[in-house]
Amino acid sequence: MGKNHLQCRECKKEYEPTFKYICDECFGPLDVKYDFPSVNKDTFKDRENTYWRYFELLPIVDKNNIVSIEAGMTPLVKAEKLGKELGLNNLYIKNDSVNPTFSFKDRPAGVAISKAKEFGLKSVGCASTGNLASATAAHAAKAGIPCYIFAPSDIETAKIAQALSYGAEYISVDGTYDEANRIAAQIGDRKGVGIVNINMRSYYVEGSKTLGYEVAEQLDWNTPNHLIVPTG
């Protein structure tokens, strides 16, 4: 297998890197696999202050295909007052709201768009009602690739205004977010559009992992005992 090959999470069948996210044999999800023994903490010393400093742990083969808007290496702030109230001596808050489009979604979107560029895809998109739409549109604009945002027709315009400001096209879908997601998946498969949170998902999720890498590095490679992750 080549660098950063895919492997089925269920049956362990392996695939070369491709525009694929579901196993042909058992329909399980495909994950990216790496040559971990070839890297250590010294690998990342004195590198750029973006999440692309972890290039060896990301699924891009050629650095020329990186689409970066300088996201990542966000502050890890020690919350002393809150920690004291909770009886915790070492409580930290990772502030990803300072990323270029104001959320952690810049991480997965950036990796997915970079892989779409590496695959030579001519257009990208996502099913989203907010932050992911903005992140996908911003990276697509940087890459010079057309971008399509699939969202319910009754969505508040303000929620996708940022994405539209980057030049993305809004595809209005009658129905719920789930319906928008289904339509996006169908168009992605039929037209060869890289839908970052659907048919590019194997690569998309790799970007989110960089937040964890940063936390470890910012703590001098000491992993935290507990993590609290807000969800919406």
Labelled PLM ranges:
Residues 1-232:
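PLP-dependent amino-acid enzyme catalytic core
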